[in-house]
Amino acid sequence: GQDRILLDCGMFQGRRNEAAEKNRVFPFDPRLVTNMVLSHAHIDHSGRIPLLTRRDFAGRIISTRATADACAYLLPDSAYIQQSDAAYLNYKTARTALGEIRKSKKAKKISNRGMEGIKKSLKKGHKLDTEAIDALIDRHHLKGVDPLYTMEDAREALTYFDDYPYRHPITVGNGVTCTLYEAGHILGSAITIVRAKEKGRAISRPALGVFT
């Protein structure tokens, strides 16, 4: 079969609902991607890698060592932000639902002190109690928000990285190689020269990140 090489896998950044919808959908099947080449660590170029690997991508992620090292911090941090954001949105949903319950006939069975106790149960000190929030959302069949990926997903994605020096030809497919050259964008960023044979002819194509 034909090899498919993915150049970057970035996160769309914009308004929450629009970004969430775009980021969850790939215009390709991750299982069909042979390998991926990452130009640099910025989230708009690397941010969906944990989603890619969670959806059964089975190849390797090629980058410079500096880019791989940066992703070891940026991807878990991205996951933490998404998990925190989802928890806060679910907390707001739960609080709103409790407000509606308070106005309903069912509220007559719950004292004000009891209702305040339920609200307080959604937090542990100054932190949100995600288990209590999720349980309330499930109990009342509310629409919750899931993070795009978790910190566990991000840590797992880091095991897919293979780092290489600049100007070193790397085999990324059958008859396909890539070479990383200094891009001068951020530390570790690279322009990728992909070399392959097409209809018996050798071709070379430069790229500084493509898929976002």
Give the positions of each predicted feature.
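His/Asp/Glu-rich metal-coordinating catalytic cores
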Residues: G1-V37, T53-T212
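Conserved G/P- and acidic residue-centered "switch" motifs that form tight phosphate/ATP-binding loops
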Residues: H40
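N-terminal Rossmann-fold NAD(P) dinucleotide-binding loop
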Residues: H45
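A short acidic, amphipathic alpha-helical/loop segment
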Residues: R48-L52
